[in-house]
A protein has these predicted regions:
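Bacterial Sec-dependent N-terminal signal peptides
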Residues: 1-22
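Carbohydrate-interacting regions of secretory-pathway proteins
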Residues: 21-265
Length: 265
């Protein structure tokens, strides 16, 4: 479970479980920059309004009242995010929240909001993410799995493979459909999990479709492997996995969520 957050004056910031003061963040930042791309920039698209409520067969992950479907970074402890007015808001001190239930293929809907008073720039501005299959922590401080990025990209320049709706550090979104900070936005995600052979080798990769505010950003995109801040993505064998909402370590005000549901496929 995340105990303490420290912020470092580097260009790239990530979500942490534990920290070590002797890490060379300048050196890590330079390594991470090798997999950041700034062109071509996705076109800006003005999105429509919010969709309807969950369908009758959906599994409700957040009903506006409780977080009974989730636990904290430590699976023995409850999710630590606060609920107010039917909305949950990231608590960066307690870390991310993880579903108790595990999934393979699914359709997911979630609504999220960048705070009106957002500050910062690039990746340090309203950063969060949806891990479609969360696989634990890598190297003690990096989240492992497949991440769809959440970020304030309304007039906020960053590397395009880290933009809102990217498969982080892998697939650039087809458009920028971000609304102004303070407005509710939504993702509709179709996830087809990877399959593995008995010996652990990859049989078929994962594929993901992402619509942001009704605008197609990822169209059955092949996922190349686990999200990596530094280096290239790769696969490790796994089965059904939980979904995680990220508590990113940047110093900007936290992201909020509501109306989260999933339909196993």
């Amino acid at each position: 479970m995340l105990k303490k957050i420290f912020f470092f004056p580097i260009l790239i910031v990530i979500s942490f479980s534990t920290f070590s003061q002797n890490r060379n963040w300048d050196s890590l930042g330079k390594e991470a920059a090798k997999t950041e791309y700034y062109t071509p920039v996705p076109p800006v698209v003005t999105p429509g309004g919010l969709p309807q409520d969950a369908p009758s067969d959906a599994i409700i992950l957040f009903n506006g009242k409780d977080l009974n479907a989730w636990h904290g970074e430590d699976s023995t402890k409850p999710a630590g995010w606060k609920i107010a007015d039917g909305v949950i808001t990231v608590d960066k001190k307690t870390g991310g929240i993880i579903t108790k239930q595990r999934f393979m293929d699914f359709q997911m809907h979630l609504e999220w909001r960048i705070p009106t008073e957002i500050t910062g720039s690039s990746q340090a501005r309203g950063n969060s993410g949806v891990f479609l299959a969360y696989l634990g922590m890598a190297n003690g401080f990096l989240e492992d799995g497949y991440e769809v990025q959440i970020l304030d990209c309304y007039n906020n320049k960053t590397y395009v493979n880290g933009q809102t709706g990217s498969i982080y550090k892998q697939a650039v979104p087809l458009a920028n459909a971000c609304k102004k900070p303070g407005e509710w936005q939504y993702y509709d995600i179709i996830w087809k999990a990877p399959r593995f052979n008995a010996d652990g080798s990859l049989k078929t990769p994962g594929y993901v479709t992402v619509l942001h505010n009704g605008v197609l950003l990822q169209n059955n995109t092949e996922v190349k492997g686990r999200t990596k801040w530094i280096g290239q993505p790769d696969y490790v064998a796994h089965g059904a996995s939980p979904i995680k909402l990220q508590a990113h370590g940047d110093p900007s005000p936290p992201v909020s969520f509501r109306n989260i549901w999933v339909r196993p496929l």
